[in-house]
Amino acid sequence: MLKKLSPIFSNITGVVRYQDLAYVASVSDEIQEQNIAHSYVTEWDCGTWCVAGEDDDMLPWEIVSATVVHEPVEQALFLGARGQVFCMGSGDIHEEQLPDGDDAIGGRGNMRGVACIDGVAYACGMDRQVYRRFDENDWRAIDTGARPPAGSEAVVGFEAIGGFGAREIYAVGWDGEIWQYDGKRWQPRESPTNLILTAICCAEDGSVYACGQAGTLLRGRNDHWEIIAQDDVDEDLWSLAWFDGALYVSSATAVYTLVGGHLKEVDFGDEQPQRCFHLSAADGVLWSIAAKDIFSFDGQQWTRID
């Protein structure tokens, strides 16, 4: 058990499961200096940190994204760049692997994101790869329509995926691309930007939000998309979360909330994070996760977790 992560670990991403239970993916600062690919998954349970499995249970691969799913059981899933998956929760810890042959990740490129849609995991990556998890260790490609034509040398890819249900899923990524899936086939939507989009949020207000490079923030649904112009924010935006009736947006230096079409920087209070990066919301709390800073927000007050 650990009292603090930050003295020896740097956080990559994380996900909140309950108000008193969350998971964070990190790397050891010492091992990272040796350029060794690795990750640790650490559980935060009622204020105590515990490395998943045994204390020496280091994953020999890099985690890129995380989510919590409800099917076939409720668990946290951590996705690796080469399609590795670490599953933890409900009394079970195991690893899975997405298709990695030449016609899949092995020949098409790295994975970039994973998300829960209607309780089920969906993963996306370069070359517009998309996979759905149908059962434990049963991931199948569902990229019909989005897959580039044979022989194409264009560099394309999805950075993030989200949806309102299995028949309305969106993926965003390189060149500002926006694609929509109806349960059978993907089709492109006209995007108002050509900048890379890095995050997506299908919000409770019925809109889909996406963000990315140079302060880009989009709103839309189906075939209509617009830029929410910002005069004061031009840094890259990395993460989105819907919390307590509002959209929260994170850059590397601040967390914002969208108020009246404008991004307003949140006030963390007396103690400020050095960095921000990833947002995760569940069960009445919002977490801001960065390499050496983890804060939790209950709708009234920000509290440092680590």
From Swiss-Prot:
Immunity protein that plays a role in preventing early activation of toxin Tse7. Protects thereby cells from Tse7 DNase activity. Interacts with Tse7. This is Immune protein Tsi7. It comes from Pseudomonas aeruginosa (strain ATCC 15692 / DSM 22644 / CIP 104116 / JCM 14847 / LMG 12228 / 1C / PRS 101 / PAO1). The lineage of its organism: Bacteria, Pseudomonadati, Pseudomonadota, Gammaproteobacteria, Pseudomonadales.
